[in-house]
Amino acid sequence: MAPHWAVWLLAARLWGLGIGAEVWWNLVPRKTVSSGELATVVRRFSQTGIQDFLTLTLTEPTGLLYVGAREALFAFSMEALELQGAISWEAPVEKKTECIQKGKNNQTECFNFIRFLQPYNASHLYVCGTYAFQPKCTYVNMLTFTLEHGEFEDGKGKCPYDPAKGHAGLLVDGELYSATLNNFLGTEPIILRNMGPHHSMKTEYLAFWLNEPHFVGSAYVPESVGSFTGDDDKVYFFFRERAVESDCYAEQVVARVARVCKGDMGGARTLQRKWTTFLKARLACSAPNWQLYFNQLQAMHTLQDTSWHNTTFFGVFQAQWGDMYLSAICEYQLEEIQRVFEGPYKEYHEEAQKWDRYTDPVPSPRPGSCINNWHRRHGYTSSLELPDNILNFVKKHPLMEEQVGPRWSRPLLVKKGTNFTHLVADRVTGLDGATYTVLFIGTGDGWLLKAVSLGPWVHLIEELQLFDQEPMRSLVLSQSKKLLFAGSRSQLVQLPVADCMKYRSCADCVLARDPYCAWSVNTSRCVAVGGHSGSLLIQHVMTSDTSGICNLRGSKKVRPTPKNITVVAGTDLVLPCHLSSNLAHARWTFGGRDLPAEQPGSFLYDARLQALVVMAAQPRHAGAYHCFSEEQGARLAAEGYLVAVVAGPSVTLEARAPLENLGLVWLAVVALGAVCLVLLLLVLSLRRRLREELEKGAKATERTLVYPLELPKEPTSPPFRPCPEPDEKLWDPVGYYYSDGSLKIVPGHARCQPGGGPPSPPPGIPGQPLPSPTRLHLGGGRNSNANGYVRLQLGGEDRGGLGHPLPELADELRRKLQQRQPLPDSNPEESSV
């Protein structure tokens, strides 16, 4: 999330310059359509175990869509998205094992990802996959939709090893032009031409030719058609790379456009089987006055026209401004790219160790140019006949001095907090006869933005949620069917370019400014322009103020049925108003009169909730409330309420539409009741157990110091002798008597019998442990506590404890024990039972 200071600082700069930044900066889509609302419009395909719908190819004549995914190929009918065929093309287990042994990931990398899929001729497709980091290519029979038998071709230079790396390619007259990374490590970039009648051609492996590029797109432009100079067709490649010419930022990444000529044959001695027409220039997507620069090129779309002169390119860019992430769309004209490639070159100066403009005379024929009529008149019919000095110049000067600037000298659209990933464009003729360009932009969180280009600015028609938090991985448009196809990691989606039926009123249809839609006066519906007569349709794409347009045509106004609401006096009443557009504002009426935006102590409009709050409703607040969605001078009825106020206790209510899923509410109530019952039973059980424990404790207390020990009568034991331990420690008598004269005896500290054998059972002495094979545990007996202490009453008349007087023995015990000291680890408990 960008800090507030960054957003406000940038907004202040835009406002201060006052150059109309509101027409391209962070525009708000007029409508937001969730995936649930698209359920009746879109078609979806997914299959267990199939992932990464990366490559989409349309064949308009056959009406088929070919899809390349991870280790699978599919053929669909475009209109119904019905599966026509499927091919499983998995990398063998041994290839995957080798991939894992080389340190690659067995979950995301060691598979066969389809990266190239295009028609080779009328009967076959040419397909290439990463094949677990050992790229392979083969042919697909379009009639049977099966892989051709035989050995797979080596895909090196045609397809990347790594599925995450950029790739661009296209087939032109049976020849494959590809831009990829040519080795396992991804350190050797290459722009390659192979297959077809000519021998293969590739770029020089030099940093100032290609420096860590990430390829995003390619385009074929037939510039020889209708050329007065006899020019050649060209193939353009779009990528981003680390700039070698930057003085201050050695690690700066810039966007590039490069081009080669279709008829390039390489040089005879210099640049043998290397491009002699390879030139590149920087693509600028910036607004210098706003200090916005976009260099991270993500995707490029080529919009062809009936004439190649009108070819337009749309680039998708990303940038970071402070902690704020931005995305932008820039438009480029082919003639601007041609102008830059005909301009001055850059040159590296060894002395200054930097790149600068080449100022010396340019040799003739012009280095890097295609073979044209001028070359033929001067005896150069092929690049093989070009002089070495021309080829050496091209080899050292592939970079142009000037950069290709965007149309309108700034981006068409900039959005903050959004990552644009893909773009396709379409040209549409409106009812006014003008041609409009409609852009469809995919995002990193699964949304599709639809915008119409209106000269130097755009209007965001809507945003559609195609996927749930999944990046859009591919996007194509069928010009003939007017259908869009988008792929993500888990599914494929088909949807029409426009859903005109969702506009329910004339004003809503016209305010959408969608070139595909118009309001039909005869049917009172918003319909697609293509299938209706223009004389009965209303459409205004360029007009921003549509007030009165629908009224003049006599269109019917649709008013929603009011909801009856009864509230208690003193209640804060919330009346929601669902606006038809994100660009609209709510206007409320009460009793037919307009309500102010805020009336302290009575009415308050909450923009966050999009609701009118009636504070402490009183009988004077009863009546009819109507909410209108007001946009560009047009008023659309949105909600209506009939409120009645009755006397009673004060509670807070919110007006809501009738619950559609009442069964779910009752189910939740029953579940909550069951949980409460279980908790109640648990509390009662714990309470019963606690009562039992307390009763046991009370009974034990009543038995304290009441019953003497009944010990068996045995013969008198011999007199006690101390144990023959030299380190015996005497006990301190202090702490072994109670305040009432009672003696504490610790079991286990008795005197030892002479001889080494087990002692004979002693006679019954009050307080002495009972005889046992080892030692008697007194913890559970009466007159003893948990530590086994026995309390002896040595004073008074009952000192004998067994009914016969033992004064001599008692005195002897008291005298002996007073001479002993407590053991170091002893800590006898003072309590007794």
Curated annotation (Swiss-Prot):
Topology versus the membrane: Single-pass type I membrane protein
One GO term of the biological process aspect: cell migration in hindbrain
Cysteines engaged in disulfide bonds, as pairs: C99-C110, C128-C137, C261-C370, C285-C330, C500-C517, C509-C526
Annotated region described as Disordered, given as residue ranges: 748-807, 814-833
Residue stretches spanning the membrane: 664-684
Key word Glycoprotein present: yes
Residues recorded with modification Phosphoserine: S742
CDD domains linked to this entry: Sema_4C
Location of the region described as Dominant negative effect on myogenic differentiation in the Swiss-Prot/TrEMBL record: 46-489
SUPFAM superfamilies in the cross-refs: Immunoglobulin, Plexin repeat, Sema domain
SMART domains, A to Z: IG, PSI, Sema
Residues with attached carbohydrate: N106, N121, N310, N419, N522, N564
Residue span(s) of domain Sema: 30-497
Cytoplasmic-side segments: 685-833
UniProt topological domain (Extracellular) ranges: 21-663
Family: Belongs to the semaphorin family.
Function: Cell surface receptor for PLXNB2 that plays an important role in cell-cell signaling. PLXNB2 binding promotes downstream activation of RHOA and phosphorylation of ERBB2 at 'Tyr-1248'. Required for normal brain development, axon guidance and cell migration. Probable signaling receptor which may play a role in myogenic differentiation through activation of the stress-activated MAPK cascade.
The name this protein goes by in its record: Semaphorin-4C
Provenance organism: Homo sapiens
Gene: SEMA4C
